[in-house]
């Protein structure tokens, strides 16, 4: 992503997503990146070496966490998955999420 002096439209960026679990980078701030993605269906189980923050933009989805109760998020709610925790987002209907994480965080984890 390049430096810009214009506002970033989250709805316009969402409209460019080609399908479930595809991501677009929205911004970088300090040592973090903000990405947007669509969730629909179940993503594979994975973990990261960094914390990962999920902020539900619209719809409803759940974060399934290994050996823990799932966390359901609706628009405006957020949850941080601690580093090392195996997890997967799951949505029965399309939902959109903002991800705030380190730039080196890979989608499919470690």
What residue spans do the PLM features occupy?
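A cytosolic small-molecule/anion-sensing beta-strand core signal
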Residues: 30, 57-58, 74-75, 93, ...
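Intrinsically disordered, low-complexity, positively charged segments
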Residues: 31-33, 40-43
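A short, N-terminal "cap"/entry segment at the start of jelly-roll beta-barrel domains
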Residues: 1-35
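Ligand-binding loop in jelly-roll beta-barrel domains
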Residues: 83-110
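Short acidic/polar mixed-charge low-complexity motifs
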Residues: 32-33, 61, 69, 85
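Short histidine-centered beta-strand/loop micro-motifs
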Residues: 25, 37, 44-48, 64-65, ...
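Short, conserved beta-strand element in jelly-roll/cupin
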Residues: 38-39, 47-64, 100
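Short acidic-glycine-tyrosine-enriched beta hairpin
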Residues: 67-83
